[in-house]
């Protein structure tokens, strides 16, 4: 190994201390030398790091060939070369590097210049890195004099603020402001082009802070590259001239080429090459048995790697282990004497295998972060060179705010030329589960039971000799194999590739960045085609309006109750995008300068009143909205893709098309949110406020039309062809709830079958009568009967006998199974038992006095009996403790919680005290409420009673029946309170008052009575 000094914070006091010989710190479990011995050992080693594989010893070196990986035969490259790119990164080159660059590209990097690196595969499967020269960074600004501007830029380049030099040019240009309707170009506008993206961004910000009107200063060089050249971040390319970088390569891949931007040709093909993927998992040992902390005295004991391709085809299985390990069938096993050697070999393997995709389960928040921290902080070893670039990046990035609050959901990964897809993050965002542990998700999504090895057993097995390490190794490999199956099941990589291609961004950006980073480049591209430019943050016309609040779209408070008549639910299709399209809302149509609309007729302008503020937009006859044209293009494309899906017979192509239409849908729905975010790249509260205001007006119009025009049965007979036989009494119609993009309309005395037949026609009639294209009201479902509890909470029965639950305890993850079963049983009575239905309707119309005199209707006694049975089961200890498990998400580190007295936090603290396996951030923490051991206190808080379920079962702890019955009463009240009489009594108190009283005595009291 080249002379490298390893810094050990435990043994060294001065980081700059020199060693005359290469050394590295050896940390390893004592058990790999003496079977069963606990603890870790550490020592300095001055021999070369090595690996043992199939009874042979290999010296670990950066340029080594990995023994178990087959070498691909080299093929002669010929122009034209066809290749597929999947990733890109920006870099800078300086004058001191020009001797390694072909002559024709040198002037682009004197004194410094941008180089775009494209990563991909050739048509024959060779890995390739393309160095693209000639892409400038630029922005625009308003300045009185070109000469003065030139002088200012030169001054900045020579100042201490920049500390770098580059070539630049200034030219006068004619462009229009994207923000605000206008007919005149921006005056005194100049385009400033720089060969160095860092300097361009820096100078743009400086001018912006000085009060200069600046445009597009925040546009990233990769966005410029894709948009300016109309290229895609993911797809097939062709290059007709080959300039091969044979010496002084900057990459670790087989082929490195140089080209100019103009040499790239985008091909129209949707297929994928087979990309190499690796799924990995690590197991760690800590000295004290606590959860591993990468900066403390711990060691990585095992790393499993599954090598597969992007279609899920397995290639090989690999296991990196400390100490000897008994052979595992079909697995390449590499043995090491210390953790550093194991980690070094793992990174060497990644470099040799050079996968395009790295995946695992919770690898961003633990595995990758742990590996990077160990190598950088414990071993003082730079790992960026193990990516696709020799001077690349291989890091886990924790934003400052996150580091401060320990909010791991924002953690990002940057590996040059390697995409990272963490299946934990993917599945926790895509599906609903009680918890997101790998075994839970495997059971739910793959219908597979994971062979479990408890957290406490792993260290014992590992130090128990080569057989024990093989057990842990199989467990580790099993996890990696499950991840491969999860990876190929959800095909998230295809979805992100479509998002990236659509938005002119890299896949890495699509995975780790928010929606504004995806929408902004799309707007930029569309504006560029219309010769418009986007103002930078401080120059927009939103100033002074950021704090203007605007209401959400809820327009009609729910008329809470139990509805034993059919309720039709109508839904607006893509409401917010369709409003923007119908009313021509856009940055470019917003009136911000009254002089610009002088001469326009009043009919050419849409006026929207949002509280005390008025917003005005020019109509399509004057200027078409760029946002509307973007949305139309995306929605039309989505329709086209869905049609292709119907005609597609190839399952793989159908899946790719599905991911494409999903990407289009997500992007459309994100546009509104980007305009309303005041801290986005291009905020515009005027658009967001106008959209919600127009949405409210639409809902109000619909309610008024239903009340004024659709109130009689004659209307439905004449318009929709119903007959008198379809009515069973006096007709009635009422809008009982309107929220965001839905309407709930109840119909009295109409045949449900006839109503379902005409419901789509009703939606079409309202659409054609009230709304502008493309706004469309659609029939969604009929609920009969319906319990409308409050906003966004209801229970209803579909015509196929399926119950629909929205926002009730039955579907909440925090509730325990026993509570859910009781609530479900009672709800079933209300929806399936005719006697209970009639009694519920009667009860809802009774007064409290009538109940005192006559009691509740007979059918309600069935509900009361269910509650009494549940109470008996709890107090008489008949409930399985597993069905009483509650849960809450550990959303951040315990120290970041302002309220420390929460039940799940108390359980985590108890687990830590007992040195049990701790949950990861983002996991659901399971707990039960146990009976108090002390009897002095009258009341106990839940956090005082919360305990780990496994510990409670193991120690035969009693449950707290009172607490669980309280939960049942609250849950049942929340679910069925609309059937209660309208009284001033609290709902829960009313339900409790109709239950018969019962006293439960302790067994010790029974024993005492026997004695007496």
UniProtKB/Swiss-Prot annotation:
Q: What class of enzyme is it?
A: transferase
- Look up the record and report any one GO term of the cellular component aspect: host cell nucleus
UniProt GO molecular function: DNA binding; DNA-directed DNA polymerase activity; nucleotide binding
Write down the EC number.
2.7.7.7
Can you cite a GO biological process for this protein? DNA-templated DNA replication
Reactions mediated catalytically: DNA(n) + a 2'-deoxyribonucleoside 5'-triphosphate = DNA(n+1) + diphosphate
Alphabetized Pfam families for the sequence: DNA_pol_B, DNA_pol_B_exo1
| Keyword Nucleotidyltransferase attached | yes
Q: Where in the cell is it found?
A: Host nucleus
State the InterPro entries in the record: DNA-dir_DNA_pol_B, DNA-dir_DNA_pol_B_CS, DNA-dir_DNA_pol_B_exonuc, DNA-dir_DNA_pol_B_multi_dom, DNA/RNA_pol_sf, DNA_pol_B_thumb, DNA_pol_palm_dom_sf, DNA_pol_type-B
The organism sits in which domain of life?
Viruses
* Main location, first listed in the record: host cell
| SUPFAM superfamilies found in the cross-reference section | DNA/RNA polymerases, Ribonuclease H-like
Keywords, ordered alphabetically: DNA replication, DNA-binding, DNA-directed DNA polymerase, Host nucleus, Nucleotidyltransferase, Transferase, Viral DNA replication
Which family does the record assign?
A: Belongs to the DNA polymerase type-B family.
For this entry, the protein name equals DNA polymerase catalytic subunit
Q: What is the lineage of its organism?
A: Viruses, Duplodnaviria, Heunggongvirae, Peploviricota, Herviviricetes
The primary gene name is: U38
């Amino acid at each position: 190994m080249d002379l490298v000094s390893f810094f050990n914070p435990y043994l060294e006091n001065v980081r700059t201390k020199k060693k005359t010989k290469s050394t590295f710190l050896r940390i390893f479990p004592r058990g790999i030398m003496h079977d069963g011995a606990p603890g870790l050992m550490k020592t300095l080693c001055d021999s070369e790091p090595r690996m043992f594989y199939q009874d042979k010893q290999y010296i670990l070196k950066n340029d080594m060939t990995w023994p178990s990986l087959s070498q691909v035969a080299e093929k002669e490259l010929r122009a034209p070369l066809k290749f597929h790119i999947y990733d890109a990164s920006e870099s800078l080159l300086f004058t001191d590097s020009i001797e390694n660059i072909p002559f024709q590209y040198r002037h682009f990097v004197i004194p410094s210049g941008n180089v775009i690196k494209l990563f991909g595969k050739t048509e024959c499967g060779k890995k390739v890195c393309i160095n693209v020269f000639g892409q400038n960074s630029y922005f625009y600004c308003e300045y009185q004099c070109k000469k003065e501007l030139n002088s200012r830029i030169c001054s900045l380049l020579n100042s201490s603020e920049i500390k770098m030099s580059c070539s630049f040019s200034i030219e006068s240009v004619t462009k229009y402001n994207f923000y605000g309707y206008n007919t005149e170009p921006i005056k005194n506008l100049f385009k400033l082009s720089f060969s160095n993206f860092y300097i361009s961004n820096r100078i743009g910000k400086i001018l912006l802070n000085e009060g200069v009107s600046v445009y597009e200063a925040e546009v990233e060089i990769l966005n410029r590259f894709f948009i300016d050249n109309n290229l895609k971040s993911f797809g097939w390319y062709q290059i007709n001239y080959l300039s091969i970088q044979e010496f002084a390569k900057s990459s670790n891949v087989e082929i490195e080429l140089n080209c100019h931007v103009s040499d790239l040709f985008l091909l129209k093909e949707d297929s994928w090459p087979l990309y190499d993927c690796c799924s990995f998992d690590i197991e760690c040992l800590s000295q004290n048995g606590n959860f591993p902390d990468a900066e403390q005295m711990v060691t990585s004991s095992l790393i499993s790697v599954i090598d597969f391709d992007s279609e899920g085809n397995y290639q090989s299985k690999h296991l990196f282990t400390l100490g000897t390990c008994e052979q595992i069938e079909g697995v390449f096993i590499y043995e090491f004497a210390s953790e550093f050697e194991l980690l070094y070999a793992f990174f060497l393997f990644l470099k040799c295998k050079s996968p395009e995709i790295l995946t695992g389960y919770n690898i961003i928040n633990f595995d990758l972060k742990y590996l990077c921290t160990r190598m950088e902080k414990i071993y003082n070893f730079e790992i960026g060179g193990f990516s696709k670039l020799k001077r690349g990046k291989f890091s886990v990035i924790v934003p400052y705010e996150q580091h401060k609050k320990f909010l791991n959901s924002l953690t990002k990964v940057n590996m040059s030329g390697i995409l990272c897809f963490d299946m934990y993050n993917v599945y926790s965002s895509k599906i609903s589960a009680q918890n997101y542990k790998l075994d839970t998700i495997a059971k739910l999504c793959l219908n597979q039971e994971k062979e479990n090895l408890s957290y406490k057993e792993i260290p014992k097995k590992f130090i128990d000799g080569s057989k024990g390490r093989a057990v842990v190794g199989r467990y580790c490999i099993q996890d990696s194999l499950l991840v491969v199956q999860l990876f190929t099941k959800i095909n998230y990589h295809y979805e992100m590739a479509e998002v990236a291609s659509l938005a002119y961004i890299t896949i890495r950006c699509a995975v780790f960045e928010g929606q504004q980073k995806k929408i902004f480049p799309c707007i930029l591209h569309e504006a560029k085609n219309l010769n418009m430019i986007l103002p930078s943050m401080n120059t927009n016309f939103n100033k002074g309006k950021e704090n203007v609040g605007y209401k959400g779209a809820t327009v009609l408070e729910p008329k809470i109750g139990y509805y034993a008549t059919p309720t039709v639910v109508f839904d607006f299709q893509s409401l917010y995008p369709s409003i923007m399209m119908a009313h021509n809302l856009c940055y470019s149509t917003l009136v911000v300068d009254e002089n610009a609309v002088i001469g326009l007729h009043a009919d050419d302008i849409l006026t929207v009143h949002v509280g005390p503020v008025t917003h005005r937009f020019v109509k399509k006859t004057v200027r078409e909205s760029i946002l509307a044209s973007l949305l139309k293009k995306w929605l039309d494309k989505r329709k086209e893709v869905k049609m292709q899906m119907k005609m597609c017979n190839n399952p793989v192509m159908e899946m790719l098309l599905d991911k494409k239409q999903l990407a289009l849908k997500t992007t459309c729905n994100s546009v509104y949110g980007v305009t309303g975010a005041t801290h986005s790249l291009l905020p515009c509260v005027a658009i967001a406020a106008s959209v919600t205001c127009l949405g409210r007006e639409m809902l109000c119009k619909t309610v008024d039309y239903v009340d004024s025009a659709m109130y009689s049965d004659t209307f439905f007979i004449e318009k929709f062809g119903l007959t008198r036989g379809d009515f069973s009494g006096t007709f009635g119609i009422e809008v009982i709830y309107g929220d965001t993009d839905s309407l709930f309309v109840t119909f009295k005395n109409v045949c449900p079958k006839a109503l379902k037949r005409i419901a789509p026609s009703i939606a079409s009639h309202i659409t054609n009568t009230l709304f502008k294209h493309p706004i469309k009201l659609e029939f969604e479902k009929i609920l009969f009967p319906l319990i409308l509890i409050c906003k966004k909470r209801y229970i209803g029965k579909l015509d196929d006998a399926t119950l629909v639950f929205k926002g009730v305890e039955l579907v909440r993850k925090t509730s325990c199974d026993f509570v859910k079963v009781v609530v479900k049983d009672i709800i079933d009575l209300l929806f399936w038992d005719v006697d209970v239905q009639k009694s519920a309707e009667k009860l809802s119309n009774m007064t409290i006095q009538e109940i005192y005199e006559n009691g509740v209707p007979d059918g309600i006694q069935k509900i009361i009996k269910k509650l009494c049975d549940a109470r008996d089961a709890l107090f008489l200890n008949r409930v399985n403790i597993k069905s009483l498990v509650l849960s809450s998400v550990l959303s951040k580190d315990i120290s970041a919680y302002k309220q420390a007295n929460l039940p799940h936090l108390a359980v985590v603290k108890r687990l830590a005290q007992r040195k049990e396996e701790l949950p990861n951030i983002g996991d659901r923490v399971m707990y039960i409420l146990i009976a108090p051991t002390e009897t002095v206190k009258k009341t106990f808080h839940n956090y005082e009673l919360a305990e780990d379920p496994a510990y409670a079962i193991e120690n035969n702890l009693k449950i707290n029946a009172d607490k669980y019955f309280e939960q049942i009463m609250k849950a049942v009240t929340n679910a069925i309170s609309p059937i209660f009489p309208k009284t001033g009594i609290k709902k829960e108190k009313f339900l409790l008052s109709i239950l018969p009283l019962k006293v439960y005595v302790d067994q010790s009291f029974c024993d005492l009575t026997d004695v007496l």
